[in-house]
Amino acid sequence: MVLHPLFAYPTVLLALGVFALYIVSLLKLRGMMKYALYLNVVLIVFALLSVVFGFGISNVPLVQSKVPFIWEFPHKWNGVFLFVLSVLTFVVFWFKGETAGKKLALLPVLGLLLTFFQFFTGWMLRLVFFS
């Protein structure tokens, strides 16, 4: 059963929301931090499931024969890195909390950039696979 798309799309949307909430909470509204932390827990679960099912689908022979390496390799390992970054972001902001400085806004900005790159490579894989 192919469950990667079921978890991948919510993961991208959650990542955009969580990292945007972290940026907003660091720059303007400090009260948004708790919502970002709660959603980050959900993001970690969805990202883990996306990575696990993504590795599962990459072992299917049809996928291996149709998907070019130039899109599969960065998509696969960027997904793992996005999962690790979401865990790292949660740990950092869980311990720092309200005392986090504005310099830590670089961590969610990096998360947003990785999320956009993950969405782009996934979309290109989809276009290549279904063409």
Predicted regions and their residues:
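Polytopic transmembrane helical bundles with strong interfacial aromatic enrichment
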Residues: M1-S131
